[in-house]
Amino acid sequence: MSHPIRRISKSIPVIDFHAHTVVQEVREFSKGHVVQTSDPKNSSMSEEAIKSMETWIASNRRKMTDYSERLKDMDEMGVDIQVLTPSLVHQYTYWAEPEISLKMEQLTNNCLAESVAVNPERFIGLGSVPLQSPPHAIQELERCMGELGFKGVEISSTAEHMELGDAKMKPFWAAVARLGATVYLHPSGITDARYVRHQLWNSVGQPLEEAMAMSSLIYEGVMEAFPQLKICIAHGGGYLPFYAGRLDRNYREKPFLHTQMTKSPSDYLKENFWYDSCLYNVDMLEYLVEKVGSDRIVMGSDYPVGESDPVGFIRDSQKISDSDKDAILGLNAAKLLGLSV
């Protein structure tokens, strides 16, 4: 399915790959099971801090549902297109029975499709699936790619208590490959009490979950079995791309542990994954470009809670070339999503 391309600039379309939405009914259904709607008093914050946090959450939640405000923000940021994804931090349903979870994900995807249809020049949808049940996930993936016209789906870092590389997940990955779907991997957040204080679930837990998810996909042979997969990892891939030397050392010294791999972990990182630019530190972005290549990175703001000037963040780099900046700002995302530019 073709998709219209809008350009604010005359040269390239600027595409934000990391932009969240919320469906209120699904959020209410998930309340109590997700990290973002857990009781803030459990974090040992002061009463003043709790009030400030509640105000911050309410403000950003409004931005996830008010599309007129979203479009205004996009124009101010210089963003032509947002890739809309359901916020798994707010409305994670993998804990539910598969049939119930499927209904919630269908509702989410229907609402997302309606939002995209209102302004298809500005929005592209990536749906959500009940990943804890691969047969149900495949069913909804096929609907997303067919009936709803999405470009792919967003998933969390685990399928509830099942790792992404688990043998039971192989049919799902086979379906993703068959349909040519793009998968955006964004953790739903660690709810373990150890990560509650100081919102460590976000600052420490999210990149840790991304590293674990990628490791599972690499070491369990998913990337080897389906090299054509298009998987983009949020937050610059978490910790893994920045610590690949240790992975490679273990691969060299303990080959008997890595029987489903034909190349080093760092090679999979460079050749089999994509990453968004949501790193909040230009030095880290430049390092990521050096290690995996500029052609593997897409711009991501983490709207509405992340980088307020995602275009400037990339443009301000002194080490990334202008052509590589153009690729990161939009051309790579267009290629990944199959858009004509």
Regions found by a protein language model. Give the residues of each.
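Mid-to-C-terminal alpha-helical segments outside catalytic/metal-binding sites
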Residues: 2-17, 24-81, 110-118, 139-143, ...
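Short glycine-enriched loops at secondary-structure junctions
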Residues: 87, 131, 187-191, 303-305
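Active-site-proximal, glycine-rich beta->alpha crossover segments in alpha/beta enzymes
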Residues: 99-104, 119, 145-149
